[in-house]
From Swiss-Prot:
SUPFAM superfamilies reported in the protein's UniProt record: Family A G protein-coupled receptor-like
Tissue/organ expression: Expressed on apoptotic neutrophils (at protein level).
Region (C-terminal cytoplasmic tail) residue spans: 326-378
Side Extracellular, residues: 1-49, 113-117, 183-216, 271-292
Protein name: Atypical chemokine receptor 2
Native organism taxonomy: Eukaryota, Metazoa, Chordata, Craniata, Vertebrata
Length: 378
């Protein structure tokens, strides 16, 4: 099974081969015999497939719409659009793995060894990519607003493209354990499961991967977002540009939503690590953490459904893209043979109008920052 945070196919209680962080057993045989998790397993077989299916449907619809609208209606690839495109692709690849895990949890792994590795690796890469691209978007706004860096220059565009490539490469490197250790395993009753088998080093690997997720997947991105948006807020308060209040509310909302979606899950993982280290715990605590992990994991996975709303649909400019796209589709549906070049051209012109929003506030705010900076130097 995937080793990062992916849904664990519900194995028999006390399976010592399972090295996913979503384990239902303790590390020593004596405790395994005492702490039965049959109720937890039964709950997961019903709850998780339903949640994974909802995430698949909502995430697929939202991110596919985001991707199509950006590709069709965006007049030129601004920096934010590039990040949104990559975020949409990452989210789509992430939600594509959900049906596989839903079937695996409800029944068992039926897709063979090759897909076991592919789906696990695909899950892990895009799990981190989604978080990293959100962080990059906050960095992009920070550079554009606080440091008034014009992002349309070739040097800035090259830097952003390099950063996008680095995000994919870094996520791929983090997912190496999925490629190496994940494989299918057959239980005594002939049921197949897909998970990582670290052999005698399972405990060390599980703890390492959990702490890695806590650090790279939550703590560092959260601190970066707090720093970037705090500095953005200070600049907006000082310069008082048009749309300041809405921009500040959006900045605060982005940080709060990220925290609310990811903190419960990462806290539960951290407590599970302490449980495995025997810092505290008994069977009752183990049961509660198992239930909590299933719920908080589902909440965290829903990030791929919320990000299109937060980072795109709250933008006036994107809503204009969407309106132009829907107008073209409606016109094509009503009269498939009617030329729509004039309409498309006018839609693109309309989409290029300058509007203040969280996703494009930098373009207006950086100009105000530069103008006021020049006035201060005179």
């Amino acid at each position: 099974m995937p080793t990062v945070a992916s849904p664990l196919p519900l194995t028999t209680v006390g399976s010592e081969n399972s090295s996913s962080i979503y384990d239902y057993d303790y590390l020593d045989d004596m405790t395994i015999l005492v702490c039965r998790k049959d109720e937890v397993l039964s709950f997961g077989r019903v709850f998780l497939p339903v949640v994974y299916s909802l995430i698949f449907v909502l995430g697929l619809a939202g991110n596919l719409l985001l991707l199509v609208v950006l590709l069709h209606s965006a007049p030129r690839r601004r920096t934010m659009e590039l990040y949104l495109l990559n975020l949409a692709v990452s989210n789509l690849l992430f939600v594509v793995t959900m049906p596989f895990w839903a079937i695996s949890v409800a029944w068992h792994w039926v897709f063979g060894s090759f897909l076991c590795k592919v789906i696990s690796t695909l899950y892990s890469i895009n799990f981190y990519c989604g978080i990293f691209f959100i962080t990059c978007m906050s960095l992009d706004k920070y550079l554009e607003i606080v440091h008034a860096q014009p992002l349309h220059r070739p040097k800035a565009q090259f830097r952003n493209l390099l950063l996008i490539v680095m995000v994919w490469i870094t996520s791929l490197a983090i997912s190496v354990p999925e490629m190496v250790f994940v494989q299918i395993h057959q239980t005594l009753d002939g049921v197949w499961h897909c998970y990582a088998d670290f052999g005698g080093h399972a405990t060390i690997w599980k703890l390492y991967l959990r702490f890695q997720l806590n650090l790279l997947g939550f703590l560092l991105p959260l601190l970066a977002m707090i720093f970037f948006y705090s500095r953005i807020g200070c600049v907006l308060v000082r310069l008082r540009p048009p749309g300041q209040g809405r921009a500040l509310r959006m900045a605060a909302a982005l940080v709060i939503v990220f925290f609310m979606l990811w903190f419960p899950y990462n806290l539960t993982l951290f407590l599970h690590s302490l449980l495995d280290l025997h810092v505290f715990g008994n069977c009752e605590i183990s049961h509660r953490l198992d239930y909590t992990l299933q719920v908080t994991e589902s909440l965290a996975f829903s990030h791929c459904c919320f990000t299109p709303v937060l980072y795109a649909f709250c933008s006036h400019r994107f809503r204009r893209y969407l309106k132009a796209f829907l107008s073209v589709m409606l016109r094509w549906h009503q009269a498939p043979g009617t030329p729509s070049s004039n309409h498309s051209e006018s839609s693109r012109v309309t989409a290029q109008e300058d509007v203040v929003s969280m996703n494009d506030l930098g373009e207006r705010q950086s100009e105000d920052s530069l103008n006021k900076g020049e006035m201060g130097n005179t």
